[in-house]
Amino acid sequence: MKPDIHPEYRETTVICSCGNTFTTRSTAKSGVIHAEVCSNCHPFYTGKQKILDVGGRVQKFEKRFGQLTGAARVARSTGKPRAGRK
């Protein structure tokens, strides 16, 4: 390996927007990383389902395609349920 080509790996404080802070190691020069979501507030870890919608993408999709899935839309339009896959 070549000497002196790797960045310094130092102790870094991570600060989440929810207020949680923890220490890890990183190559960040400032020694501080600001995060929007951490394991304290992320829906996967907390069990709370909330949609992190950026720019109204979910509403735009629902407006364009409706809230029904493809199979439900076919069943609704024909009046009979659609057979599932095996």
UniProtKB/Swiss-Prot annotation:
The gene is rpmE. One of its GO terms (biological process) is translation. Its cofactor is Zn(2+). The keyword ATP-binding does not apply. One of its GO terms (cellular component) is ribonucleoprotein complex. NCBIfam families: L31 (TIGR00105), PRK00019.1 (NF000612), PRK00528.1 (NF001809). This is Large ribosomal subunit protein bL31. It comes from Acidothermus cellulolyticus (strain ATCC 43068 / DSM 8971 / 11B). Part of the 50S ribosomal subunit.
